[in-house]
Design a protein with these regions (language model features):
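GIY-YIG nuclease catalytic motif and its immediate N-terminal context
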Residues: 1-57, 61-97, 121-152
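Alpha-helix-centered segments that form part of catalytic cores
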Residues: 97-119
Length: 152
């Protein structure tokens, strides 16, 4: 089965993972316990990045962005903030937002580091990642569609 080609699950609390491929194209999936949250690809212009001598590109930079918790600049973080973090904010936490002692990005990053895991698969051809992404988003690989970005 294709799902067995993916890495094991790694916790974002341990990001960055040792020995993670520094320059690589691929597909990744993000989990909250047993719920598939998000599927995406990274590394579209891998050849160009390699020719330019980039030392970090593709999967590592995308997952690093997700680990940051910055909702304004990262689609996954925006989905997570809007669908999971904001609905769980308590009245006590709201007062901390008002006085500036807590930000949405801080809460999103905290949630990611405490609860979220990722898996990835490095590919030689980016088109393979795109093809697999469609299958994952339709529920064909993991038996469920991602909560945040499914395809019909």
């Amino acid at each position: 089965m294709l799902k067995n080609a993916f890495s094991k699950k790694f916790k974002f609390k341990n990001w960055p993972k040792k020995n993670f491929p520094a320059v690589a194209a691929g597909i990744y999936v993000i989990w909250d316990e047993q719920t598939l949250l998000y599927v995406n690809t990274a590394g579209k212009d891998l050849d160009k990045a390699q020719r330019a001598g980039k030392t970090k590109f593709g999967l590592i930079t995308r997952l690093n962005s997700h680990a940051s918790g910055r909702a304004a600049s990262d689609q996954f973080c925006s989905f997570l903030a809007n669908r999971i973090v904001i609905p769980s904010i308590t009245s006590g936490q709201l007062s901390k937002f008002r006085d500036g002692s807590v930000t949405l990005d801080q809460m999103t990053k905290k949630y990611i580091r405490a609860n979220v895991e990722y898996q990835y698969l490095v590919v030689d051809k980016f088109q393979d990642a795109l093809d697999l992404e469609g299958h994952c988003k339709r529920g064909a690989i993991f038996g469920e569609k991602p909560l945040f970005n499914p395809l019909d």
